[in-house]
Amino acid sequence: MPSNCRRFEGKVAIVTAATKGIGLAIAERLLDEGASVVIGSRNQKNVDEAIEYLKNKGLTKVAGIAGHIASTDDQKKLVDFTLQKFGKINILVNNHGINPAFGHILEVSDQVWDKLFEVNVKAGFQMTKLVHPHIAKEGGGAIIFNASYSAYKSPPGIAAYGVTKTTLVGLTRALAMGLAKDNIRVNGIAPGVIKTKMSQVLWDGGEDAEKELTDIQEIALGRLGVPDDCAGTVAYLASDDSSYITGEMIIIAGGVQARL
């Protein structure tokens, strides 16, 4: 959704997993408000297509690099690439996440459990460690994690995924306390059911299926979310408009009652 704000002129942001869905919407919003943005994703073709999409909309201060977010070598390449392209880092959006398991939590294998935590939790922690000195050098900035409402309200079938997102709530709070001295704010978003490829299996069945899902999930606003619903909140958390907010997680779920 286009914005008339220009809150990020002169700022540089990294957005992980940013070639589709929520990540792409976040990158577009930050670019639209004046930021220079580096997008990351595993697939170079997806990176190239996302950059072309953004540039066709007149958002030219964008670059991207392919890599696996759980690879320490690729994490460093992403940070180094950003510094080479734009000279600094002010904002990090840890948007990445996977959910390879569906079923009862006790049926999740050790291998899948470890993979969930490696990508959903550890990779964002490692990225934060890498960018920390660069953001601190600029006098501070913002780091945002993409968690999930499943951190608070474990939906059937994705409990293991939800545990990793609950962990992100704790990690966000811990990092907020640890980085406050450097004027780096750490916050997060906890989206509900957002219409993306990752959640498509839940809602892909026409209006009747969506209506049934909103009823089952008890979504007060009566609709599913879209990526722009998340992008606007991330832009707020990345901006000086939220300069007195850190360690918080904003639930974006249309009124679903989800709290720890």
Curated annotation (Swiss-Prot):
Transmembrane segments: none annotated. The active site is at 161 (proton acceptor). It holds the Pfam family adh_short_C2. Keywords: NADP, Oxidoreductase. PANTHER family: DEHYDROGENASE/REDUCTASE (SDR FAMILY) MEMBER 4 (PTHR43943), DEHYDROGENASE_REDUCTASE 4 (PTHR43943:SF2). Catalyzes the reduction of isatin, 4-oxonon-2-enal, 9,10-phenanthrenequinone, menadione, 2,3-hexaenadione, 3,4-hexanedione and 2,3-heptanedione. This is Dehydrogenase/reductase SDR family member 4.
